[in-house]
Amino acid sequence: QAFENVIKQSLANANLQPTDIGHIHGHGMSTISADRGEAVAINKIFGNQTPVVAAKSYMGNLGAGSGSVEIISSLLALDKGTLFKTLNYDTPDPDCDIQVTNSIDTPAGSSFINLNASPQGQASAVIIKSLQ
């Protein structure tokens, strides 16, 4: 529920619709329960068409540094115009009906939402939109 709440609030604060978001940078903890909960929230708001990436697939969980690295990763993707693939994503979980990116030619769009969560159940989301 926390992810759903922060996604909705972030979209409202930015005066954007889900279709305005080019990609989603998921928290992506790679645990069954956390990933399913995040995927349900993403699917409920965005459906399964908006591409989802996870930088943690490259470096693991960096703790408090994860959010900054994830934002930088998505900013670089915006600049390049394409997303990076999510490593080790081979078999989609039918309980996680989202569009996880597993190729390097997926368009990044001109905006993204970055999702993060704490072990205590808090969640945050930030939306960044290109000026171009």
Segments (PLM) and residue ranges:
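Conserved "HGTGT" condensation-loop signature of ketosynthase/thiolase-family condensing enzymes
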Residues: Q1-Q132
